[in-house]
C-alpha cells in the first residue's frame, strides 16, 4: 500500500504538488479575489495570514492528519489554487478531500474535476481507501452541485458544525464515495475529462 502523501499527482492540465512555504507568494496572488473565500473558514488575504495558514497546514501534515497541495496549471506553470487530503485515518483507510479553492479564471472548467480525479484515484487505487468524503457549507449550492457532479452520494447534514467567520453557525452537508462505487465514478469522470480535453486524464 502506497503512502497517501506527501506526493505529486500529475494530470493532462494540472499538477498537484505538496504545498510548502515557498508557495506563499504564488498562493497569495492566486487567492487575492475575496469571493474565493466566501465559504471558507480561513481567509488568508495578507502575507501574514498566508504564512500562518501555511504554517498550520505544515503542522497538520507533520502529524499525518492532512496532506495539502498547490494546484499548478501545466500550460504556464502558474499556481492557481489549493486542495488537500484531510481527516486522514490510516487504520480505517478513510479520508476527506477539501479546503479546495481556485483563482476565478479556473472556475467552471476542467481544473476541479481533474484535481478530484487525481486525488480520488490515488486514494482508492494506491492507498486503498474504503471511503472518500467531501463536505461543504449547506449554503454553498455551487460547491454542492460540483460534488454531486463528481458522483458522490449525499449522506446527511451536520448541524451547527462550525462557526463562520461572520459569527453565524454553519450546517455542513456531507457527501462520500466508497470503494465499491469508485470504478463507476472513475469511468464517468474519465469520460467527462476526455470530452473536455480530447485526451485521457
Write out the residue ranges for each language-model feature.
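GNAT-family acyltransferases
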Residues: 1-111, 122, 126, 167-201
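Conserved glycine-rich acetyl-CoA-binding loop
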Residues: 103-117, 130, 138-144
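Conserved GNAT acetyl-CoA-binding A-motif
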Residues: 125-135
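Conserved catalytic-core motifs of GNAT/GCN5-like acyltransferases
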Residues: 135, 153-167
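Short Gly/Pro-enriched loop/turn and capping motifs at secondary-structure junctions
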Residues: 139-140, 161-162, 181-182
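Conserved active-site alpha-helix within GNAT-family acetyltransferase domains
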Residues: 140-156
